[in-house]
Amino acid sequence: MSARAGIVVTGTEVLTGRVQDQNGPWLADRLLELGVELGHITLCGDRPADIEAQLRFLAGQGVDLIITSGGLGPTADDMTVEIVSRFCGRELVLDAAVEARIGEIVKGMMARFPGVDADAVLAANRKQALVPAGAVVLDPVGTAPGVVVAGSPTVVVLPGPPRELQPMWHAAVATDAVQTAIAGRTRYQQQTIRMFGLPESGLADTLRDAEKTVADFDRLEITTCLRRGELEIVTRFEPRDTATYAALEGLLRDRHAREIFSTDGALVDDQIAELLAGRSIATAESCTAGMLAARLTERAGSSAYVAGGVVAYSNAAKTELLGVDAGLIERHGAVSEPVAEAMAAGALQRFGADTAVAITGIAGPGGGTPTKPVGTVCFSVALAGGASVTRATRLPGNRSDIRERSTTVAMHLLRRALTGGG
């Protein structure tokens, strides 16, 4: 049986949703890469009894490794190290070398704040130099060191900020204690297929058939997820089952070739960035109010191909900023394929681009009519030279869902236009 792990994400701000947890999913991926089975991710607040209860729960599940995140700061509610020390039966001791290192970091930070009492800050941060006796101390990235406490289970204590946790994790994995804890791991392979335009029921039908026709199908660990209107199929398997996975992938390709857009885990955003190399794109948005432009510019280096965008929310803005004929809007309505086409053409001209995408729709909750209900969205992708792809669809969900799904639809229409998929 493979080595197993559990993760405890601490922090009342995470528990209550004020801060979104990034550490649990990131650590889950890293464990998967190591071939370690993840049994549980738990969230709890800053109360010591709650944190200790999570540690005892995971230990009772027989995990070999527990990883905690958060609660390593200098304030009174940062008590994770103390709780782990008690859980592991270790005395809490002051590490002079760690104290000196933290002192150097704090003095460097305080040099930028001459009016602050550095000695008072140092006294508060002294708490961070208290570590369980015999623990391996991980050098701080911020001011908080991490610790690794060997045992059954071994416990890795990491800071909460992802920018500190992520580099420290690699140091933790290299320790003898963690290597011993995960010695029984099984090396897995993981493959991801992404689809767009296929309902979950259609994929479910194919997987039911695969269960009957693909030899050793039960040796594949398959998870599916619908996100942003896309289907993600993640399959994990041992190297000896590569042929079984190949048979599954072949069946998916046979049934859903048009809907599959990625078999190597690449996101549509990655593909669009590659397809736009050497091109210039402009956006014209109404109901999404700049969300598509924001998504296109999330990738570093996007300034090489994103010329600009216009948020033309009102009819007047569509006319004044994009040159859409007011009579066209009067005849067809602002949410219509002709207006979407005119918006895309206007963006091409305004920015001197060779590619443009336009979105106009009714995100709700009001504004719908019997002929154009809430969720009606029209898209147009225009390429220099006259080629264009225009679509109208009705998207489900609330206002936020419709706006987010609209950006996804637009990205896929753009992908198909740039690859000649129509």
Curated annotation (Swiss-Prot):
PANTHER family the UniProt entry points to: NICOTINAMIDE-NUCLEOTIDE AMIDOHYDROLASE PNCC (PTHR13939), NMN AMIDOHYDROLASE-LIKE PROTEIN YFAY (PTHR13939:SF0)
Top-level taxon of the source organism: Bacteria
InterPro entries the record matches: CinA (IPR050101), CinA-like_C (IPR036653), CinA_C (IPR008136), Competence-induced_CinA (IPR008135), MoaB/Mog-like_dom_sf (IPR036425), MoaB/Mog_dom (IPR001453)
Entries under Pfam families matching the protein: CinA, MoCF_biosynth
Name this protein carries in UniProt: CinA-like protein
Family: Belongs to the CinA family.
